[in-house]
């Protein structure tokens, strides 16, 4: 008998409802079920046709007036106890998810769980949710790693059908997998060094010490570094493109698109500078050149090819669009509310710079994100109170989705690290040798042939097998052992 269960004995004049739940039969008063008319059994009593009854139960016997449900009879005892007592009780040995699904089927809300069981029930449910999420994340990580390994092997198989397949295969592996060998590591280090040098050169370009009066770079060293970096990026992209097993899949890789975008500004700027235009278009062409030069900042994204953290960040943002959208929604609502409030109390102050709602939007944005530039600030007491509330709300609003995003980032980062460890621990594809093949019959024939040859060499000839005595058998065994030892020594 489950906790709190007791069987109600109806009087003779009371009409009963016959229930059959997975073989467990029970007769219940109609008045007991009608206490909760929004549950499945309560709705069952209000049905006026057999079709409506069969929508709520699995079968119905007109002769016996029995309703059949293909459900767990053990869990139904807890449901039946709820109709008698008005409270749900959850035993420790029950699965919380199974119990939750069962009461959801019967139309019973979790709010009916008694106070003695509700706290523990919610704790177990949250623990199960966390474990289930971790398990799914691990399964996804394992499946993704397996799929990526399978795709890598399939890509290697394609080289056998291509022209210069073996050469392209060696180049492609060294360009894509820095952990493959020493030369692959040197290529990765060189590429990373060139990216960093290009970023440093781009920053130095903006310094006035290296520019002439027209704002152009007037330093041959910086120009040489820029040309050398672009030559490296172009050559690297061309080699990857030529060695790739599939040109279509090559351009679907975001990292390859970043490589292509990083070199476009240089060649576009070069084409614009060499093109002769009329005086009217010089100003417009200059603006285009400036924009193209600013696009060189995309080179910094090339670091994602060599950085586990950047790749994990990209995967996290790609799979956390819901949380990021929720964060932007919270901030937008808060900015709209506090900008109007601060404008209403600061607009009449002459010393205040918060004289329009767009300016108040800017102030609310930097306040809710806890940046606080200090260029605009309230001067009235009411404005300072609103500002304090805005900052506190900003901390709370930003902190809510950030935790979820951080957990996902940790998962993807660990996944990327595990994949790198797997790549380093596995033998390179070219170094994997097949297991040696042995034919037992051939090996046995060779051993017998060597044994007969050794017998002939020491003068032992067996003419008649029936005349063989014990001493000859012992001699044969000694000879066999000697021959086997010589054969093993020779090998």
From Swiss-Prot:
Heterotetramer with KCNB1. Does not form homomultimers. Pfam families: BTB_2, Ion_trans. Residues 205-220, 276-285, 344-357, 378-384 are extracellular. Residues 1-182, 244-254, 307-321, 414-491 are cytoplasmic. A motif (Selectivity filter) lies at residues 370-375. Keywords: Cell membrane, Ion channel, Ion transport, Membrane, Potassium, Potassium channel, Potassium transport, Transmembrane, Transmembrane helix, Transport, Voltage-gated channel. The lineage of its organism: Eukaryota, Metazoa, Chordata, Craniata, Vertebrata. Signal peptide: none annotated. The gene is Kcns3. Residues 358-369, 370-377 dip into the membrane without crossing it. One of its GO terms (cellular component) is cytosol. The transmembrane segment S4 functions as a voltage-sensor and is characterized by a series of positively charged amino acids at every third position. Channel opening and closing is effected by a conformation change that affects the position and orientation of the voltage-sensor paddle formed by S3 and S4 within the membrane. A transmembrane electric field that is positive inside would push the positively charged S4 segment outwards, thereby opening the pore, while a field that is negative inside would pull the S4 segment inwards and close the pore. The chain crosses the membrane at residues 183-204, 221-243, 255-275, 286-306, 322-343, 385-413. It is found in: Cell membrane. InterPro entries: BTB/POZ_dom, Ion_trans_dom, K_chnl_volt-dep_Kv, K_chnl_volt-dep_Kv5/Kv9, SKP1/BTB/POZ_sf, T1-type_BTB, VG_K_chnl, Volt_channel_dom_sf. This is Delayed-rectifier potassium channel regulatory subunit KCNS3. It comes from Mus musculus (Mouse). Disulfide bonds: none annotated. Its main location: membrane. Potassium channel regulatory subunit that modulates the delayed rectifier potassium channel activity of KCNB1 by namely slowing down the deactivation and inactivation time constants. While it does not form functional channel on its own, it can form functional heterotetrameric channels with KCNB1. GO terms for molecular function: voltage-gated potassium channel activity. SUPFAM superfamilies: POZ domain (SSF54695), Voltage-gated potassium channels (SSF81324). One of its GO terms (biological process) is protein homooligomerization. It is a multi-pass membrane protein. Belongs to the potassium channel family. S (TC 1.A.1.2) subfamily. Kv9.3/KCNS3 sub-subfamily.
């Amino acid at each position: 008998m489950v906790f709190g269960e007791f069987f109600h004995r109806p009087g003779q004049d009371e009409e009963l409802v016959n229930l059959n739940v997975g073989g467990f039969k029970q007769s219940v008063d109609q008045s007991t079920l009608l206490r909760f008319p929004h549950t499945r059994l309560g709705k069952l009593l209000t049905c006026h046709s057999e079709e409506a009854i069969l929508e709520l139960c699995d079968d119905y016997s007109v002769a016996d007036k029995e309703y059949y449900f293909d459900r767990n009879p053990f869990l139904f005892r807890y449901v039946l106890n709820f109709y008698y007592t008005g409270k749900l009780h959850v035993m420790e040995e029950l699965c919380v998810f199974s119990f939750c699904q069962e009461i959801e089927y019967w139309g019973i809300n979790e709010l009916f769980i008694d106070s003695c069981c509700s706290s523990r029930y919610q704790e177990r449910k949250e623990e199960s949710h966390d474990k289930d999420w971790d398990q799914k994340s691990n399964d996804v990580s394992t499946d993704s790693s397996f799929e990526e390994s399978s795709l890598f092997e399939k890509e290697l198989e394609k080289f056998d059908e291509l022209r210069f397949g073996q050469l392209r295969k060696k180049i492609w592996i060294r360009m894509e997998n820095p952990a493959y060998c020493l030369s692959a590591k040197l290529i990765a280090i060189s590429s990373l060094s060139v990216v960093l040098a290009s970023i440093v050169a781009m920053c130095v370009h903006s310094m006035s010490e290296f520019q002439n009066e027209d704002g152009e770079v007037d330093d041959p060293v910086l120009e040489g570094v820029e040309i050398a970096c672009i030559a490296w990026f172009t050559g690297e992209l061309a080699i990857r493109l030529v060695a790739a097993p599939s040109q279509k899949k090559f351009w679907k890789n975001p990292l390859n698109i970043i490589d292509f975008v990083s070199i476009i500004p240089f060649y576009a700027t070069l084409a614009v500078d060499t093109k002769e235009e009329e005086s009217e278009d010089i100003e417009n062409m200059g603006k285009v050149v400036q924009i193209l030069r600013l696009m060189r900042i995309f080179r910094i994204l090339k670091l994602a090819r060599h950085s586990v953290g950047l790749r994990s960040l990209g995967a996290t943002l790609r799979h956390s669009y819901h949380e990021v959208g929720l964060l932007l929604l919270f901030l937008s609502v808060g900015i709209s509310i506090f900008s109007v409030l601060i404008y209403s109390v600061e607009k009449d102050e002459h010393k205040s710079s918060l004289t329009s709602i767009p300016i108040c939007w800017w102030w609310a944005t930097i306040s809710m994100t806890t940046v606080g530039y200090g260029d605009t600030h309230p001067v009235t007491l009411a404005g300072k109170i609103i500002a304090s509330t805005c900052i506190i709300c900003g901390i709370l609003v930003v902190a809510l989705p950030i935790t979820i995003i951080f957990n996902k980032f940790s998962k993807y980062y660990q996944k990327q690290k595990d994949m790198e460890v797997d790549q380093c621990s596995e033998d390179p594809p070219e170094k994997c040798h097949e297991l040696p093949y042995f034919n037992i019959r051939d090996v046995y024939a060779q051993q017998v042939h060597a044994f007969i040859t050794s017998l002939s060499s020491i003068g032992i000839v067996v003419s008649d097998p029936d005349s063989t005595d014990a001493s000859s058998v012992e001699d044969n065994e000694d000879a066999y052992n000697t021959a086997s030892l010589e054969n093993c020594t020779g090998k």
